[in-house]
């Protein structure tokens, strides 16, 4: 969407910073997935210093699980194709070595996301919210399946904060704030460049 202060042409808003997915990591990561740094106790196929997908409930698990940003794609040497491939998602296999991935981690960025099955209304603006990690993304398009949960609260370790609703054009899919799965604008809440604690 842009940033809280707008997005002039010279701004880095929406740009992606380089991160790594560990070689042999068995979980797919999709375009648009929320991601965080791996910590002890996570999937043993990854390790410290690498990113891992956000899972619903991570924000309630304590301050050590801190959002990094939004996954925007990756490149890796494919063992099946015998060449470097550029993909909007990581399939959870086929990488011969660590995967170069790109994450928008701009702490001022804002994002449009679907609400859960319960509509997100004006009364929810300013609240904190988690994301559902299921259903998983689409392997044909590589697009994330994540959407907001139905719980809007004051919990400060949750990854996102509701800042606005999409209400136009009237009648468009996602613009009806009385219907579930409407479109919502969120900002990073507990994010690595905003949080005081490290991982």
Regions found by a protein language model. Give the residues of each.
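Surface-exposed, low-hydrophobicity beta-strand/loop segments enriched in small/polar/acidic residues
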Residues: 1-199
